[in-house]
Amino acid sequence: MVFAALDPLGVPLGTAQASFGTDGIRGRVGTLLTPAFILQVGYWCGQVLPDQGPVLIGMDSRSSGAMVASALTAGLTAAGREVWTLGLCPTPAVPGLIRKLGAAGGLMVSASHNPPEDNGIKVFGADGAKLSPAKQGLIEAGLRGEAIGDKGRPTITSCGPAYQRNELLSHYRDALLASVLHQRLDGVPIVLDLCWGAATACGAEVFAALGADLTVLHGEPDGRRINVGCGSTQLEPLRRAVIERGAIMGFAFDGDADRMLALDGHGRVVDGDHVLYLWGSDLQDRQALPQQRLVATVMSNLGFERAWQQRGGVLERTPVGDQHVYAAMVESNAALGGEQSGHILSAAHGLCGDGVLTALQLATLCHGRGLSLGEWLDQSFQAFPQKLVNVRVPDLERRMGWQHCEPLQEAVLAAEAAMGEDGRVLVRASGTEPLLRVMIEAADSAAVEFWTAQLADLAEQHLNRGCV
């Protein structure tokens, strides 16, 4: 029976303006993410997720994480769901444990690479994949106060139980080691930047278990310093440590450890495109890459695409967001895909972005070939000059509707015409931050600088002054 959503929790519904972005619901704690709103999110997740099995909740190290997880637990149990909280863990641990334990779904409390004052909620279904847009829409409808199948006001007899199950993280650690067949890294000098975040739960532990000679930066959970001047968005601390310690590789993670960027021994960046090329080449050499296909996003470098084509490979591009990469990989039966930013998805390892697993794969593949990461990088490709500028556009309507700004659209067309087949223009409104991202890529670095400045200036001038 379907009932109207008439305040089943005693909390006013329909007042929060929130929706799923490219990576869940995300925002400033105390502004969007209030206890009352988070409780509603938990409740409506409980209505939408399958009825059988527990719902798992993991979290990164943010100071607000306990509040968010507690409010989600209250909402889920009010919907009659059984909740197992995992404590501090990387995001990929949640979908991995969903599949292993037969859970109904899971939620990860994290704002990924965002600053400490933000937080977010990622929702996974019973298959371990992020919820489909249709199911996300049902949760959004519930938050607006619309009828989606509410079971009525919770009662003492209808509330579900909640259990703390931190010990389950050991299954994830075991899976990480099994992913590289327990290959050894004895004495290999490696630096890890754990970002004060979720990677501190197991990152150093698994590398140490393989015998690596480790240097660990930002290696304790710290909710006030997560992502601050460190991790995959701030590589300079890792670069200094790699060079000073004479390491042959270094890995930096973001706040929830679902992505990773690497540095070679000279401090050169190994981004997601390079990881896809190197790991994909290994799979191709072993005839383990169906259709010679890799899946990447529109952000991936043109130099990567052309080099992969020269190897006889196919590069399929998707919109930005690992959920789009996931969908394309499932549809085309691809073995490997990911984003330039460092989200890498492997069909053999659960099709979920996993920074620690990717770092282990890269380290063991290099070591197994008798190469340093720099030597292997030299065998990859020469990236086209590429520049990304973030233009702050707080107004959501103007940001999402940038295509209707005639001066900006005309400049985009002019840039594309000027660069021809040797360049690309990508303008994209962020789904998680108040930013318009302007990316220019071309064989000519001067063209990159010129058109990036032109488009960024036009976006700043017009979108923040009422062009749309």
Swiss-Prot record:
Binds 1 Mg(2+) ion per subunit. The active site is at residue 112. PROSITE patterns: PGM_PMM (PS00710). Disulfide bonds: none annotated. Its EC number is 5.4.2.10. It is an enzyme of class 5 (isomerase). Pfam families: PGM_PMM_I, PGM_PMM_II, PGM_PMM_III, PGM_PMM_IV. GO terms for molecular function: magnesium ion binding; phosphoglucosamine mutase activity; phosphomannomutase activity. Mg(2+) binds at residues 112, 254, 256, 258. The modification Phosphoserine is found at residue 112. Activated by phosphorylation. Keywords: Isomerase, Magnesium, Metal-binding, Phosphoprotein. The keyword Ubl conjugation does not apply. It catalyses: alpha-D-glucosamine 1-phosphate = D-glucosamine 6-phosphate. Its cofactor is Mg(2+). InterPro entries: A-D-PHexomutase_a/b/a-I, A-D-PHexomutase_a/b/a-I/II/III, A-D-PHexomutase_a/b/a-II, A-D-PHexomutase_a/b/a-III, A-D-PHexomutase_C, A-D-PHexomutase_C_sf, A-D-PHexomutase_CS, Alpha-D-phosphohexomutase_SF. GO terms for cellular component: cytosol. GO terms for biological process: carbohydrate metabolic process; peptidoglycan biosynthetic process; UDP-N-acetylglucosamine biosynthetic process. NCBIfam families: glmM. Catalyzes the conversion of glucosamine-6-phosphate to glucosamine-1-phosphate. Belongs to the phosphohexose mutase family. This is Phosphoglucosamine mutase. The lineage of its organism: Bacteria, Bacillati, Cyanobacteriota, Cyanophyceae, Synechococcales. The gene is glmM.
